[in-house]
Amino acid sequence: MDYIFDKFTEWIKNLLVDGIMNNLSGLFDNVNAKVSEISTQIGSTPQAWNGNIFNMIKNLSDNVILPIAGVILALVMTLDLIQLITDRNNLHDVDTWMFFKWIFKTACAVLVVSHTWDLVMGVFDVAQNVISRSSGIINGTLNIDIASHFADLETRLQAMGIGELLGLWLQSFIVGITMWALSICIFIIAYGRMIEIYLVTSVAPIPMSTMVNREWGQMGQNYLRSLFALGFQGFLIMVCIAIYAVLVQNMIVDTNVSTAIWSCMGYTVLLCFTLFKTGSLAKSVFNAH
């Protein structure tokens, strides 16, 4: 009877050890892949990230939004002319210079609207240049490999009791599900930012058509601030990833396997939290809303 019980105990222990090793071997693979992917994607301009989407958005902007922006521009400049004339003592003090001033403002407004796409892409080209230069300064591995810190991990697991192994297997399983969810969060941040860029750029002519007007100009100015916030959000993401890389490189793994698993996951949770904060931080820096 003792022989049968020992064999059953050994079988359960081997099953738990194999399960723990399998859970730990690929525990951080998805997160490592997503972190490497996001560090590459944030350095891409809208046209380089996906050419098909870029062309579609540009066609929509040129063929659908630009005519609407032209109507808004005509309305804004007409109101501006009326205000310019009535401000001069109700037409009793009209001078010809004000018409030249209005013609100059209108010409500038038409120039801005007709070159909106170039101006918008210029903002992201500047941001991409900043990110590329920062990536040359920031170095370091972004990968977490928990198994590499425990060369004798399987031997140590074999020395544990069934209760300890069962608890460790349950922890590794829970952490594995959590890491899968975190990898999805990183994916959402990377792709969500690029989709937001495409959405914002698609309507660019409308806010840009209000730039030269005193009352309506706040719309265009806030739009430009939003563009810079979106562009430089990539730089903040790069800084977050750099801090994450330093933490991973200097990670002191505890001799306790359970503590090591949770500490590694803690770094990844911290990364996700800071990545989600980059959008609001960039908007607050550029006073965009």
Which role fits each region the language model picked out?
Residues 81-94, 183-187, 214-216:
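Membrane-water interface regions at transmembrane-helix termini and the short interhelical loops
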Residues 74-78, 180, 201, 274:
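Hydrophobic alpha-helical transmembrane segments of multipass integral membrane proteins
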Residues 67-79, 197:
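Hydrophobic alpha-helical transmembrane segments
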Residues 75, 120, 124-127, 185-188, ...:
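Membrane-embedded alpha-helices of multi-pass transport/permease systems
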Residues 1-72, 88-97, 107-178, 217, ...:
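Gly/Ser-rich, low-complexity
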Residues 175, 179-211, 225-247:
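Alpha-helical transmembrane segments of helical membrane proteins, especially in multi-pass transport
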